[in-house]
């Protein structure tokens, strides 16, 4: 699952 940058 691709997570957006923090």
From Swiss-Prot:
Function: May act to induce hypotension. Presents moderate hemolytic activity at physiological concentrations (micromolar range), and weak lactate dehydrogenase (LDH) release from mast cells. Does not induce mast cell degranulation, and antimicrobial effects. In vivo, injection into mice induces increase in nociceptive sensibility and causes moderate edema formation. It also reduces locomotion, suggesting an increase in anxiety, but causes no alteration in rearing (standing on hind limbs).
GO cellular component: extracellular region
Protein name, UniProt field: Cryptide Pep-11
Species for this entry: Tityus obscurus (Amazonian scorpion)
Keyword Ribonucleoprotein carried by entry: no
Highest taxon, organism lineage: Eukaryota
A Gene Ontology BP annotation from the UniProt entry: killing of cells of another organism
Compartment(s) where it occurs, according to its Swiss-Prot or TrEMBL record: Secreted
Alphabetized UniProt keyword annotations: Cytolysis, Secreted
Tissue: Expressed by the venom gland.
């Amino acid at each position: 699952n691709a997570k957006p940058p923090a």
